[in-house]
Regions:
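Register position in tetratricopeptide repeats
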Residues: 18-19, 52-53, 86-87, 121, ...
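Structural marker of alpha-solenoid helical repeat scaffolds
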Residues: 35, 69, 103-104, 138, ...
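Start-of-helix register in tetratricopeptide repeats
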Residues: 7, 41, 75, 109-110, ...
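Alpha-helical segment of the N-proximal tetratricopeptide repeat
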Residues: 5-41, 45-52
Length: 226
């Protein structure tokens, strides 16, 4: 039987969950499942309820059941990935987030972000850079994603590609010394030495103890910086 979202029992279960009465909501959802057996939405809601109580392994099983019943359930894949990430099952989480991105009309920007983050942790630099590139297109204002993207570009000696996210970060977080240092590294890699000097000096203005910027400036200006 298809779930009737006007059903008073469904409305009551949702009200209990949304008001934080998770134990009672659990019982209400389990009763609702007897009325609407094998309903993917109810299993999804049970997963959400378990997640809210910190029962991550239980939530994982419930999201998996929801996906089994509805293989294109993008939100269930996303929440499954979040749970797997939180319990340290990074490879499984990565697969769940990647699945979200393949489902038509269910692309979830945060799934791309998490996929990039996991790839960073797993050392998959190329895949991580691709993920953060994609995320930047839909959420260009994310400072954390832009920072990771810039780090990856510098690590891969893709200095020109690092300039844009770093310039944006420098404009939006002007007192973040690390960003100015990284921007200096990018300019240095492109042999734009005058711009690099400006960036390293700015990094030192913010953080006078930055030995990396001092070393770079000494190399560029033949002047010891202390």
């Amino acid at each position: 039987m298809e779930l009737n979202q006007s059903d008073p029992e469904y409305i009551n279960a949702m009200t209990l969950h949304l008001t934080g009465d998770w134990a009672t909501a659990q019982s209400a959802l389990e009763q609702l499942l007897k009325k609407y057996p094998d309903n993917p939405l109810i299993y999804f809601l049970l997963g959400n309820n378990s997640y809210s109580q910190g029962k991550l392994d239980t939530a994982i099983d419930q999201y998996r059941r929801s996906i089994y019943l509805k293989p294109d359930f993008g939100n269930a894949y996303y929440k499954l990935g979040v749970c797997q990430y939180r319990v340290g099952k990074l490879q499984h989480a990565l697969e769940s987030f990647q699945k979200v991105a393949t489902l038509k009309n269910q692309s979830h920007a945060m799934a791309i972000y998490f996929a990039g983050l996991i790839d960073v942790l797993l050392g998959n630099d190329a895949a991580a850079a691709e993920a953060f590139d994609s995320f930047r297109k839909v959420s260009p204002e994310s400072h954390i994603a832009n920072f990771y993207l810039a780090q990856l570009k510098l690590k891969r000696n893709e200095f020109k590609d690092a300039l844009d996210p770093l310039a944006q970060l420098a404009a939006e977080t002007p007192h973040f010394a690390e960003v100015h240092y990284m921007l200096g590294v990018a300019h240095y890699g492109l042999h734009e030495n005058m711009e690099a000097i400006k960036c390293f000096r700015r990094a030192l203005e913010i953080n006078p103890n930055d030995q990396r910027s001092k070393t770079r400036l000494a190399l560029l200006t033949d002047t010891p910086w202390s």
